[in-house]
């Protein structure tokens, strides 16, 4: 009887019982229950969902058998390295043709005038102009094939891409030139690559080229093509030294009248020769094939395919120099999927204005720009309460990010972060950073504040652009991800720095279809970079983390020995000191005849006055830069950061000089990718460095 009673109590109610129950409720109660049910249903269908990573985040790479410790990506087919993502896109020419096809002749290249909306060239317009320009080049004594090198000396703009595609359409090779190479390097490149034709944007660059010819330094240069208008005086000056000066439109018109059938390249054909800057001696010309470039961006696509699929609706903002492969690689992804590329006006100060007008979805950045964004955001939080609220909101968003949730519609976005997102156009869904190490603090904050996927990569021109990339779903910082599916990575002992592979540390080496073919006409330096087994020795020091990701811990290339015999890697030290709140830029200098380091510090003009005021030091920016009291406060803050980061005493600077003006591309102290040009910095601050050593002895 007891069992039957229990079963009777536990039985589910009949439908008639439920109906009777609801009829007994008041109308107000029923409406309230309905509203509650609707809210619950809405939350269930719209609650934020964590991104599912494409692999086990605790094992993002694996060792390759019988390879001497090399590791590979676990994403995709691990048995062979990825050479391409699409069968119909194995060269850069095919990449663009694929974009033309799938976009339905959609908008391709965008540009704008001040305070005007973007104007667009369609894919078909770009392809036609490229064919006409290429045909026109052939009419002016250029030859079809990879023996023909064409110089492009211009800032980012649609004509740059048209010129590049013109070369690819007829299997010619692009050689980018840029201002910061300096006249001597430009002369060296023109002669080394046997360049007879250079396409430039502005007349002053044409004049620079003519000056070399007039001094009989570049006898092979015969044709200079200008994108912008020029006067007859320039044309006449060219005639006098045997150089034909033509407008780009005239060459296109000539090609339209004498159209040639395209002669597309093969994957193994040379596509571009990128000459590096910022090193001692003559620049090195890294030879990259179409297959190199396609393999590299295919690796990127493979890693991100589960969470980020590029489409025709994607918009890329182009402001990083096209002369460097980081920008070229990201743009290739966009063209391959029929997306749009909008160019900045040419003034870095108007970036935010351009982004608001363009509303990009893809935004490649260098860490220095991320640092500036981070510093500016916190500088605007100018009271203790505002700063506390900002940090509180960031921590709440960062907790979501750690759980795999990436979104821009939370309550914290509405209250704090929407304005930050709007400054980038409000539609960014992917940020890619590379070219230098990024601060974990900055990356962690911006992943939360910007509400989009932020990836970090590592590589160099010699492996096309990237060789590692962070995995979707792994939003931790302090590493550069796992190997791309297009290459293997191994570490080798760096004896002079005391890094050993037995401890999971060593010089980073890369091998795969994205690795370059060597330096143009420079066998000695090619042998230094590429060993007999095809491994590229990067000169960077890395460490494998337990999850199979790579951490950059040092740099072999810029190390030097102090007088007492200790090796020092200045870039590692600079990456620590740059986190000092008032410091915008820093150059750490050492000498093998000296026993300690000194530094050149450029304070942040927006942050330093407030920071100084908190220390009880008053004055405007110029006055503060001359203040001995402030200099000591900044040095103390830097040394404290160094101690917290585990720097040895010999790695800490003992004296600093405060410099008012920023290092820049324009003053020749930064490369176009905003890396410090160490030889130039050393020479520029020679007097100040000598004084620092004399005072500190």
UniProtKB/Swiss-Prot annotation:
Residues 46-697 are cytoplasmic. GO terms for biological process: cellular response to insulin stimulus; fatty acid transport; long-chain fatty acid metabolic process; long-chain fatty-acyl-CoA biosynthetic process; neuroblast proliferation; neuron development; phospholipid biosynthetic process; positive regulation of long-chain fatty acid import across plasma membrane. It is a single-pass type III membrane protein. Signal peptide: none annotated. It comes from the Eukaryota. GO terms for cellular component: endoplasmic reticulum; endoplasmic reticulum membrane; membrane; mitochondrial outer membrane; peroxisomal membrane. It holds the Pfam family AMP-binding. It is an enzyme of class 6 (ligase). Its cofactor is Mg(2+). The keyword Acetylation does not apply. Gene3D superfamilies: N-terminal domain of ligase-like. Its EC number is 6.2.1.3, 6.2.1.15. GO terms for molecular function: arachidonate-CoA ligase activity; ATP binding; enzyme binding; long-chain fatty acid-CoA ligase activity; protein homodimerization activity. Expressed predominantly in brain and, to a much lesser extent, in heart and adrenal. It is found in: Mitochondrion outer membrane; Peroxisome membrane; Microsome membrane; Endoplasmic reticulum membrane. The chain crosses the membrane at residues 25-45. Belongs to the ATP-dependent AMP-binding enzyme family. 5 rat isozymes encoded by different genes have been described. ACSL6 corresponds to isozyme 2 (ACS2). This is Long-chain-fatty-acid--CoA ligase 6. It comes from Rattus norvegicus (Rat).
